[in-house]
Regions:
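Intrinsically disordered, low-complexity terminal tails of fungal membrane proteins
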Residues: 1-27, 210-231, 292-318
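Membrane-water interface of alpha-helical transmembrane segments
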Residues: 42-52, 75-78, 105-115, 141, ...
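Seven-transmembrane alpha-helical bundle of G-protein-coupled receptors
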Residues: 52-62, 78-91, 115-128, 154, ...
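Juxtamembrane membrane-water interface segments of multi-pass membrane proteins
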Residues: 69-76, 100-104, 133-147, 176, ...
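Helix-to-loop junction signature of class
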Residues: 89-102, 164-175, 205, 245-260
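Extracellular loop 3-seventh transmembrane helix
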Residues: 108-122, 165, 183-198, 230-292
Length: 318
């Protein structure tokens, strides 16, 4: 259902970009002379094949590495991360087509669909990972929301925010200027709500770590030294870095839309890579080294049934 809502939003938004073009224009001329002022060019620039090639290679290789990690160490519940990395690389590859044919509606819509849709899988992976990490540590009492509800609650918020965005994008495809402006405001509200939802998730995660550090020294400090690939705090740091990358991208997309499709952010390719593509890349490539399956053993969990002073602690149910 979440993916269906996301798909509807992306299709509507892509249509809105096309509908915003002036009507009764003369046939397009040379698309490479002045792309910024070319009403037939939805990007308003010609994509760089160098940046596209480097970015595509990074994402494709990372997706393959993540798939190998999953095969080697398990944690199939992170499958959405692997799929999202592959689909994002497909979106980047489509930019090769736009560099040759910048007027192609079909290529643009497909490119936009993959590039904007794929990060949904990255958010979902972080939601799922936090739930598994908390259950593995038997530390549900330090999380404000039950671990098994974290994913459900935040994915539900995604469905609502994407539905709002889809509604706004659909209104933006009309010919009435007032309706178009209203649709853009609704779409921006949905995007801002999505950003707020993930920011809330990140805050929830930070509070969980702080409470764990203050109240559960038997979990925070290992009784015996363990290698880095068995130290849950290394995985926790990786999740934190992933959240930072996703938040950067979320802020970028929100500000970009508030400026409009001809704004500075939307029409500057370097900002697309610097504030969208590469922050998201950091958010996923970190799991190549810190693959959750190396840290989280669903059979053997951290034993927290006894605290430092010997007081029994109830084990969190899976």
């Amino acid at each position: 259902m979440a993916w269906a809502a996301t798909l509807a939003f992306l299709c509507a938004q892509s249509m809105a970009v096309m509908a915003a073009r002036p009507k009764n224009l003369p046939p397009p001329g040379d698309p490479f002379i002045d792309p910024y002022n070319d009403p037939y060019n939805p990007l308003r620039y010609i994509p760089s094949n160098v940046l596209t090639g480097v970015s595509f290679a990074l994402y494709f290789l990372t997706a393959t590495a993540l798939a190998l990690c999953m095969r080697r160490w398990g944690a199939r519940w992170m499958m959405c991360l692997v799929i999202g990395a592959y689909t994002f690389s497909i979106g980047l590859a489509l930019r090769f087509g736009l560099s040759k044919n910048p007027h192609s509606k079909g290529i643009y819509i497909a490119e936009y669909l993959f590039v904007v849709l794929s990060p949904c899988a990255f958010l979902a992976a972080d939601y799922i990972l936090l739930g598994h990490l908390v259950r593995y540590l038997n530390a549900g009492q330090y999380l404000f929301i039950r671990p098994d509800r974290v994913m459900k609650i935040f994915l539900a918020s995604d469905i609502v925010t994407f539905a709002i965005q889809a509604c706004g994008g659909g209104m933006s495809t009309t010919q009435d200027q007032k309706t178009i402006e209203t649709g853009q405001h609704i779409f921006l509200a949905g995007l801002a709500a999505q950003m707020a939802s993930f920011a809330l998730f990140s805050a929830l995660y930070i509070v969980f770590l702080v409470r764990l550090y203050r109240n559960a020294p038997e979990i925070w400090h290992h009784q015996t030294p363990v290698p880095w690939y068995r130290n849950w705090k290394a995985l926790a740091a990786a999740l934190g870095l992933s959240c930072v990358g996703i938040l950067i991208r979320s802020v970028y997309r929100t500000v970009e839309l508030s400026e409009g499709f001809r704004g500075h952010l939307a029409t500057t390719e370097s900002l697309f890579y610097g504030l969208d593509t590469y922050p998201l890349f950091v958010a996923i490539v970190v799991y190549v080294l810190f693959w959750p399956g190396r840290f989280i053993n669903e059979v053997e969990r951290v034993d927290t049934r006894e605290t430092v002073n010997g007081t029994p602690v109830a084990e969190e149910k899976a």
